Amino acid sequence: MRKDFFFAAAAVMAFAAMPIQAQNSRIVEEGGSGPYKAIMMEEASLTTHTIFRPQDLSKFDKKNPLPVVVWGNGGCANSPSGHINFLNEVASQGFLIVAIGPSNYQQQEAPRPGQTGDVPRMGGGMPGGMGGGMPMGGGMPGGMGGQRPQGAPQGAPQGGMGGGMPRMGGGMPGGGGMGGGMSMGDPEGLKQALEWAIAQNADKNSPYYGKLDIDNIAAAGMSCGGLQALHMLDDARIKTILVMNSGFFGTDESEDKASLAKMKQKSVIWILGGSTDIAWENGNDDFKRMSGSMPACLVSLDGIGHGGTYMQPNGGDYAKVAGAWLKWWLKGDKEASTMFTGNEPGVGKMAGWSIERKNIK
């Protein structure tokens, strides 16, 4: 039986929902190891999201613009707190990252993009009607699972009692109130991030005026956030997609699966955590369905599982691999491309990593 990768959301969200320090900006890990020391911050013009970017914007202009990455979080969480080391490290390589959710998660009162109910709270409802809240401490939640919201993608969890691992097509486990807001895979938050970046680049009163490379934008995300990124497949403004610990699920006839064969003018990479990653089957099946001439890659770190290396120092190996992919596709960095090209791609030389490719030489 095919596994639903959202089984692992309970384990991931135990830490992913933890609040970031209550402040408008923060230096994470001394700004990262890249050439552009990064900062995590909020912008008054986009309070529903968190920005990760180089601290010194004076180094960027129309001749050296910042590519943009829009990011969706694991569990469709309204906070990037479970990924800050990773996002900060990638930003230090010279990228503007716009992540769904405010940095001050615990005190957030405003609804997130597309939200129709209360914001998720600690021990409260998971967003998107996917069931109850995840408890602190990593214990498996109980209680009533959520209902699939109207218009949710095929295969979205619905109903069912919690208290244990959810079934295929069953509800996310409970433990709190009903979740409100964005349905599973809803890319609205990513679209708002993208449109904000484009508008800021054109606004003469913005600190980002003329400094962003709006022709080179990536959509990326982990687990449920990876589904959000995949649902940007038909957005012509997106150049590449990073699907991390994620993949479409459903039947062979599902619209989501069919969309993979129709993808045009994009590249996509799946970054998985080995056979113990609950998204392993989903991601591999998606990769196999890629057809035509579009570049596609599947890389995996054996044994790391669904949680990845996001909160390891400087984001761990995931930041190295994702950063190289972004530098290749958004900056044209030939050295970075060697991580994925040639007879002996660099990813394959990294301990524990494997790589498969389509239309990449």
Region roles according to the model:
Residues 18-22:
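Sec/Tat signal peptide C-region and signal peptidase I cleavage site
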Residues 81-109:
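Short amphipathic alpha-helix adjacent to the substrate-entry channel of hydrolases
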Residues 23-64:
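N-terminal cap/lid segment of alpha/beta-hydrolase-fold proteins
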Residues 239-312:
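The feature captures the conserved acid-bearing segment of alpha/beta-hydrolase catalytic domains
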Residues 118-128, 162-164, 169-214:
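Alpha/beta-hydrolase active-site loop
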Residues 148, 165-166, 172, 294, ...:
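Alpha/beta-hydrolase-fold serine-hydrolase catalytic core, especially in secreted/extracellular enzymes
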Residues 192-262:
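Primarily recognizes the serine-hydrolase "nucleophile elbow" in alpha/beta-hydrolase
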Residues 63-74:
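Short beta-strand element of the alpha/beta-hydrolase
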